[in-house]
């Protein structure tokens, strides 16, 4: 890691580094850093519109499909950092929005458009928790 990195600053272990007097606090009493639409970075340009998309975009989609998807993409990406990077930077609360596709098995992350299947990203989170057991 480089000087000033999240590992050096302790962001990836901030929960493990809490003082003993805070360890007995209910988690609801702590301010926990989180990210909004945490997995939106998995959405690719031109992705299919998701059920949480604005109704007007659904109505326009049959006529202006590529333009509508480009417009949706421009505002649906609220995170550029991967789940792994977010965790290493101290994020401990993920805003996960999930939906199914009508014609495909599995669950996908969404924010106006469909992103990745949830399995791989959840594996990444699990790997972090295996490496940092007290987080």
Q: At which residue positions do the language-model features occur?
A:
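Active-site-proximal binding-pocket segments
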Residues: 135
